[in-house]
Curated annotation (Swiss-Prot):
GO CC list: HslUV protease complex
Main subcellular localisation: cytoplasm
Positions contributing to ATP binding: I18, G60, V61, G62, K63, T64, E65, D254, E319, R391
Record bears the keyword Nucleotide-binding: yes
Cell compartment(s), UniProt: Cytoplasm
Gene responsible for this protein: hslU
SMART domains according to UniProt: AAA, ClpB_D2-small
Family: Belongs to the ClpX chaperone family. HslU subfamily.
UniProt entry tagged with the keyword Thylakoid: no
Assembly and binders: A double ring-shaped homohexamer of HslV is capped on each side by a ring-shaped HslU homohexamer. The assembly of the HslU/HslV complex is dependent on binding of ATP.
Gene Ontology biological-process entries: protein unfolding; proteolysis involved in protein catabolic process
Source species: Shewanella woodyi (strain ATCC 51908 / MS32)
Name of this protein: ATP-dependent protease ATPase subunit HslU
GO molecular function (one): peptidase activity
Amino acid sequence: MSEMTPREIVHELDSHIIGQHNAKRSVAIALRNRWRRMQLDADFRQEVTPKNILMIGPTGVGKTEIARRLAKLARAPFIKVEATKFTEVGYVGKEVEQIIRDLTDSAIKLTREEQMKKCKFRAEEAAEERILDALLPKAKEDWDNEKPDDSATRQVFRKKLREGQLDDKEIEIDVSAPQVGIEIMSPPGMEEMTNQLQSMFQNMGLGASKRRKMPIKEAYKLMVEEEAAKLVNQDDLKEQAIELVEQHGIVFLDEIDKICKRGEASGPDVSREGVQRDLLPLVEGCTVNTKHGMVKTDHILFIASGAFQMSKPSDLIPELQGRLPIRVELDALSADDFKRILTEPHASLTEQQIALMGTEGVKIEFTEDGIESIAQAAWQVNERTENIGARRLHTVMEKLTEELSYEASDKSGSTIVIDAKYVSDHLDNLVQDEDLSRFIL
């Protein structure tokens, strides 16, 4: 679990996302509150429930990007799902409980990686011994000895192995056969039976080994993973993962506006209102059965987001509105924001283009007025056609550098200056012609 302060979280988000200070503050506080809650005594901790967040803002302003960056910062089980993928129980589509099952799977993966890191030193020692055994088979009379012969020859080979002198030498080793991965599409309500069937098929090949020939460097990596996996206690792993999900899990529900009921149509709508009703128990707290055990959702943090262009937050059913108490509105982006997006974030669009062309030996220089012209062009197209936010910059940038990208291999060693004139020559016709803008930009 991340121990970063809200100020540190916002600072980290600032290096990737321009503006939207209120949204960054809200998610930073929510993330810090997860840590604060864990500092309370156990009895009081149960009473403190997370304050779920609803982010409202037009498309392309950074809602999904905030979620992506938050996942990296949280160091906790995190899952981003599209609300449109789910339907009411009994209809075609995923059940909402699958969200918690997927979250638990991600926690298992996270916990396994942590435990394998702790066992790494012991795993490396065991892998080293296995490789030395393959390089120096024991003499027949030594087979009954429990401890391998630590002779001078073995020490010489151990030294060479550690120094990387034997990396390219090929050896034959026994490696565990990969588990048989079988995907079974289950009808609603039969997930438990499906999980048992999958486990049965996976266990059929368990314990089998396969003899393979490979370079020592590759064999060593494989053996370290194998030995580390042997040292991980599966029961403890599941217990810790479920605890991690229940206390630190974060679910990001994207496109929640698409499951709002629109218009005055009567009767239930299984792919909209039905999904909201199914989401209610998860958000307010229930117990979900997963293949790893029962998971309580009482303290999982839910962050929902939507553009709400065709609907409004009040179109959500009242019960769900009440479970999303913190509302954050994200601002539409201006031409100045576009200019900052092109230059300020880590690995910005201009930096990416410079790096990509650099691989062909072409040097690109973006001038101040050139960047301003690109930002202005993207903003104008957004104003005249559909406003898709910062995503428009990708389209404009690709169109601007299309010819250069095509001919880059023939221009090795040259320097291209992208200034206002260059932008005008390549984009003006498209930007001014509204019909062309609609189809090309």
